[in-house]
């Protein structure tokens, strides 16, 4: 997992509350456990007019040329609700998103996102409103998420955000559960070496 310190990129506004994980990655695409390849199915039922994914929906925001290459998803409250599928953050990351900004996230989704190196930023609802207004009036404007300073910046706007210090440490250093364990490999090995061989 790659560490995250700062990221600046185009923000795409998904102006919907309570976006659930079935909308993020529909159930028919969950057959595999490899994290790669889910991006093409992200928001499938909204992005495409057909089941095969061959006819893009021109009305859906991710299909609009002005948001091409967006790496920040701006969303509304309770993003990632519904079932706890880890495929949802996989799909968002595989599509190219580095960070998500919303006023709230579903708890399980929030943890899954962090565990997969995707940075979910919680701002006050009125701050999210201001970002939506900015992106609407200046399509293609870049937003900067600075995890080292716990700041979101865009144009003249600047907002602080809070994140659990342990989770922040993991994101800054690119550590998932395996990476954290490997940091203590020498200590674990020394402990195991002291144990009787018959245990």
From Swiss-Prot:
GO terms for molecular function: 3-isopropylmalate dehydratase activity. It catalyses: (2R,3S)-3-isopropylmalate = (2S)-2-isopropylmalate. GO terms for cellular component: 3-isopropylmalate dehydratase complex. Keywords: Amino-acid biosynthesis, Branched-chain amino acid biosynthesis, Leucine biosynthesis, Lyase. Transmembrane segments: none annotated. It is an enzyme of class 4 (lyase). Its EC number is 4.2.1.33. CDD domains: IPMI_Swivel. Pathway: Amino-acid biosynthesis; L-leucine biosynthesis; L-leucine from 3-methyl-2-oxobutanoate: step 2/4. GO terms for biological process: L-leucine biosynthetic process. It comes from the Bacteria. HAMAP family: LeuD_type1. Heterodimer of LeuC and LeuD. Catalyzes the isomerization between 2-isopropylmalate and 3-isopropylmalate, via the formation of 2-isopropylmaleate. This is 3-isopropylmalate dehydratase small subunit. The gene is leuD.
């Amino acid at each position: 997992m790659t560490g995250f310190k700062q990221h600046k990129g185009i923000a795409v506004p998904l102006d919907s509350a309570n976006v659930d994980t079935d909308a993020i990655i529909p159930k028919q695409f969950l057959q595999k456990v490899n994290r790669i390849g889910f991006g093409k199915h992200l928001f499938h039922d909204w992005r495409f007019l057909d089941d095969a994914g061959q006819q893009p929906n021109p009305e859906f925001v991710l299909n609009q040329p002005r948001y091409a290459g967006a790496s920040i998803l701006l969303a509304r409250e309770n993003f990632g609700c519904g079932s706890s599928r880890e495929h949802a953050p996989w799909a968002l990351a595989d599509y190219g998103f580095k960070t998500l900004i919303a006023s709230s996230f579903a708890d399980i989704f929030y943890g899954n996102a962090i565990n997969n190196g995707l940075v979910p930023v919680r701002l006050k609802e009125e701050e999210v409103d201001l970002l939506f207004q900015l992106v609407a009036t200046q399509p293609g404007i870049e937003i900067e998420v600075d995890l080292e300073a716990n700041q979101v910046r865009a144009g003249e706007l600047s907002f602080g955000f809070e994140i659990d210090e342990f989770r922040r440490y993991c994101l800054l250093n690119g550590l998932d559960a395996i990476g954290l364990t490997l940091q203590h490999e020498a200590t674990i090995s020394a402990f195991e070496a002291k144990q009787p061989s018959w245990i």
